[in-house]
Amino acid sequence: MSKFLHLLRQLDSSQIITLGFLTVILFGAVILSLPICSADFTFTPFVDSLFTATSAVCITGLTAVSTAYHWNILGKLIILMLIQIGGIGFMSIVTMLFIAVGKKITLKERIVIQESFNLSQRHGLVSFTIYIFKFSFVVELIGAFFLSLRFIPQYGFVRGIFYGIFHSVSAFCNAGFDLLGKTDHLYPSLTSYVGNPLVNLTIMGLIVIGGIGFLTWDDIYTKKYHFRQYCMQSKVILLTSLFLIFVPAAFFFFRDFAGMPVKERTLCALFQSVTTRTAGFNTADLSGMTGASQAIMIVLMMIGGAPGSTAGGMKITTFA
């Protein structure tokens, strides 16, 4: 045991972050493979549970089995926890646990936190981590409230609230997991809500808020609406995000979804533009889109979101 602890102390910050995520993924995969997590209370093949856990922690949204029908409530809660850990970061969770038990954050731990969020300085790291938790909780709570307004009438009170929470967290963390499977189509995502403004705007808002990044929102909160005072990174992220949302959306509007009414067509074009950059939801059959639109979506997927955000990709700042 002492040798193992000594080995851990020798790891650098990037190795600690990598090992932490691998540990979370493997732990989640083992739990998901157990009968207590499946709807029919049978063992899930480990490769399927490992794929699901990896996809959740890495906020990818790809699934090997139906999230709606294969997993029971415990399995869905495990997936939700993995998404949250992947979205706000492994080191954020560890830091908050240290704060909760009164443990002092060491210099090495501060360096790990700094690297996990791509921060340029170590000053105020603990307060920044607390800010991330508070910000995430408030945004996800608001998103869950609005989504529940639609889900409760459709699924009942308890299930509607759970669906609201699950999809709010999944959208904010840019994960793309959903619980809306149908018996005739196991992976419909949000296609049944293509014309629903409440669901579309809420999901899009959560994706954008999560994808812009915690540093950008901290800059906005500190300097309010004085755009000229924002740091260069925040300006680049905000302006480029607007470009990457509305220009592809306009292209999708005129090239795809021709049979839809104007309202649905507008929502659908905007939604596909927003969600493509790592979120993974969809409100339309993407296989029916034109080749040019699919090529644009591939580029958007590659770009992703902002540094220090819940989104993946090569990052907006790299693209800009």
Question: In which residue ranges do the predicted regions lie?
Answer:
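Membrane-proximal intracellular helices of multi-pass ion channels
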Residues: 1-320
